[in-house]
């Protein structure tokens, strides 16, 4: 083994020289230079400074403007709630641990940080699944006369949290575990060992199949069908130009969210899968640190995409920030006119 395993941790560094210490008790500066830990702290500070206000603003603006409380927006706002949990309960923890060079909050803090990071990522993934299915049903119309309503949205939100918790809760109760990873300043699922005491192997297989491969397969299937249907409808002019334009723009926004998710999370999932399938292989702490910390940027991109590509929300946000007046003078009537009856979302 090219790493050192101990109670509730696995350090990717051989202890032949005797320098390895518990990541819960002492700084891990033998893994990387102190300035690298400072860079991690600065990065986490940036995510907190950007992530909290933009996600909070997304929720606040929606509460202030009733017209934004539409069924499909419930799913999008659900992402903001999950991101806020990640920022408040996860990122603040990682900021402090990075400043100290080790996980100062102990095993309980590691469990909390790992839980919220995993939950946030899984809520985002399953929300994208719900959005993909909604787009498929609305655009492809496999069920005639179906309208995505408030009850469907509430069920979709509940579904995302049930599936996310089905992934993040088991390690708390002994099916796998949360341990520090990379430079030992953030926590995640134990991909590093096959510890039979925690049944790591079965959980990692379950996680990759049920909570990564299956949802991505559903997403790709839905959008594959959707692209084909949109092209066919455009060729046959089956719907009005306004409806087609609105549906295409809503779909484009969701597809961009999927691409952003893949950019953020596929590197982490790929590295985790490599480590799991190459037990005992030689890899450094930075090998897992970079994708793990890069994945945390997912807390920012969803609201940014939503704000940039949703004109109605953009106007409402400007109105809220400017104390009830929109200095740009955009006509809300032109915005709401572009809404579709099926999705109730007004894209840019």
UniProtKB/Swiss-Prot annotation:
Residue interval(s) of motif 'Ionic lock' involved in activated form stabilization: 134-136
Entry GO MF terms: 11-cis retinal binding; G protein-coupled photoreceptor activity; metal ion binding
Lipid attachment locations (S-palmitoyl cysteine): 322-323
Keyword presence, Transmembrane: yes
Protein name as it appears in the record: Rhodopsin
Subunit structure: Homodimer. May form a complex composed of RHO, GRK1 and RCVRN in a Ca(2+)-dependent manner; RCVRN prevents the interaction between GRK1 and RHO. Interacts with GRK1. Interacts (phosphorylated form) with SAG. Interacts with GNAT1. Interacts with GNAT3. SAG and G-proteins compete for a common binding site. Interacts with PRCD; the interaction promotes PRCD stability. Forms a complex with ASAP1 and ARF4. Forms a complex with ASAP1, RAB11A, Rabin8/RAB3IP, ARF4 and RAB11FIP3; the complex regulates Golgi-to-cilia rhodopsin/RHO transport in photoreceptors.
Entry-listed glycosylation sites: 2, 15
Keywords from the UniProt entry: Acetylation, Cell projection, Chromophore, Disulfide bond, G-protein coupled receptor, Glycoprotein, Lipoprotein, Membrane, Metal-binding, Palmitate, Phosphoprotein, Photoreceptor protein, Receptor, Retinal protein, Sensory transduction, Transducer, Transmembrane, Transmembrane helix, Vision, Zinc
Role of this protein: Photoreceptor required for image-forming vision at low light intensity. Required for photoreceptor cell viability after birth. Light-induced isomerization of 11-cis to all-trans retinal triggers a conformational change that activates signaling via G-proteins. Subsequent receptor phosphorylation mediates displacement of the bound G-protein alpha subunit by the arrestin SAG and terminates signaling.
């Amino acid at each position: 083994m090219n790493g050192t395993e101990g109670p509730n941790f696995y350090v990717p560094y051989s202890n032949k020289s005797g320098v390895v210490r518990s990541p819960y008790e002492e700084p891990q500066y033998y893994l990387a230079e102190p300035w690298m830990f400072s860079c991690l702290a600065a990065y986490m500070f940036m995510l907190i400074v950007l992530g909290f206000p933009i996600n909070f603003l997304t929720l606040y603006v929606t509460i202030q403007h009733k017209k934004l409380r539409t069924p499909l927006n419930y799913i999008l706002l659900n992402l903001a709630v999950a991101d806020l949990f990640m920022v408040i309960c996860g990122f603040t923890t990682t900021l402090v641990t990075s400043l100290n060079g080790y996980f100062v909050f102990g095993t309980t803090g590691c469990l909390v940080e790992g839980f919220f990071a995993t939950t946030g990522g899984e809520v985002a993934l399953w929300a994208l699944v719900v959005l993909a299915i909604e787009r498929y049903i609305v655009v492809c119309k496999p069920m005639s006369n179906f309208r995505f309503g408030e009850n469907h949205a509430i069920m979709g939100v509940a579904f995302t949290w049930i599936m996310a918790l089905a992934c993040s809760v088991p390690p708390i109760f002994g099916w796998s575990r949360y341990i520090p990873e990379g430079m030992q300043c953030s926590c995640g699922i134990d991909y590093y060992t096959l510890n039979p005491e925690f049944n790591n192997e079965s959980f990692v297989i379950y996680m990759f199949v049920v909570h990564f491969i299956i949802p991505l397969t559903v997403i790709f299937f839905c959008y594959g069908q959707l692209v084909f249907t949109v092209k066919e409808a455009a060729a046959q002019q089956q719907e009005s130009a306004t409806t087609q334009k609105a549906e295409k723009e809503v779909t484009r926004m969701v597809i961009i969210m999927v691409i952003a998710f893949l950019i953020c999370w596929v590197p982490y999932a790929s590295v985790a899968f490599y480590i799991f399938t190459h037990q005992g292989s030689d890899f450094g702490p930075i090998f897992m640190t970079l994708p793990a910390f890069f994945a945390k940027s997912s807390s920012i991109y969803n609201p940014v995409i939503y704000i940039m590509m949703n004109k109605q929300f953009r106007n409402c946000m400007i109105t809220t920030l400017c104390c009830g007046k929109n200095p740009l003078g955009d006509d809300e009537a032109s915005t709401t006119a572009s809404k579709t009856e099926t999705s109730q979302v007004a894209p840019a």
